[in-house]
Amino acid sequence: MGLSVTVLGCDGSYAGPGGACSGYLLSSGDTHVWLDCGPGTLANLQQHLDPREISGIVVSHSHPDHWGDLPVGYAAFAYYFDRHSIATYGTSDTRERLITAKGGAVDDVYDWHTITDGSEFDIGAFHFRCAVTDHPVETLAVRVEIGSQVFAYTSDTGSAWPLTALGTGIDLLLCEATFPEDQAGEFAHLTASEAGAAARTAGAKRLVLTHLLPGADHEAARTNAAAMFGADVEIATTNLRIDL
């Protein structure tokens, strides 16, 4: 059974009109993983899956545009979906911030497993491996394997992190491209050109850009990334489904 990636939200840092922040649904057979849980992604998740069928949750880091729906998700899972003990993987800092935001314990719903650089774990059919990126808080990119298929997600990173830390043989790379070219190096994020170059160096077969700022010029980003990648590049949009 192949892997599908559904974009639940892809706006960088904040959601634009009608948009949602970072979140993705990874599915294969009866395995369904909610990867990053930014504001707006729980609503979009319900367009594609009954939330009771979630196999696990993975959160890349503690910036709220990547986990902001977890506190409201707690109420939904605990009181309406009757779903408890969901295997949840994230950094220790993310868990602490979630507990503060929710105002109390969360482990009855989110069975938390702390992950860090080099962590490996399985959720259903998926095998995950983590690598810490170039970002102000501990941020984990993930490599996801199912059979011979490989998906990789950078989460947030600057150019000081080598994508090759996730290994080679990446069939589909979902790579952040937050900034326009004239802001390269201003903060720990990538431009589209930097994303394209990193994907080429890592030998990725397919590149999808995500985490662009609301209002960003998508065609310019696509063109700049493709020039460095050496092949066509796609731009993530909410509710886009990508099949491997």
Task: List the predicted regions and their residue ranges.
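Conserved beta-strand hairpin/beta-sheet module of binuclear metal-dependent hydrolase folds
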Residues: 1-52, 138-155, 172
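Divalent metal-coordination and catalytic microenvironments
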Residues: 5, 24, 36, 45, ...
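Active-site environment of divalent metal-dependent phosphoester hydrolases
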Residues: 14, 64-67, 97, 119, ...
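Active-site neighborhood of phospho(di)ester-bond hydrolases with catalytic His/Asp-centered motifs
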Residues: 34-38, 55-65, 91, 151-155, ...
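Active-site metal-binding motif and surrounding structural segment of the metallo-beta-lactamase
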Residues: 40-87, 171
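Metal-dependent catalytic neighborhoods of phosphoester/phosphodiester hydrolases
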Residues: 69-77, 100, 217-225
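Catalytic core of the metallo-beta-lactamase
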Residues: 103, 113-169
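Cap/insert and terminal regions of metallo-dependent hydrolase folds
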Residues: 159-243
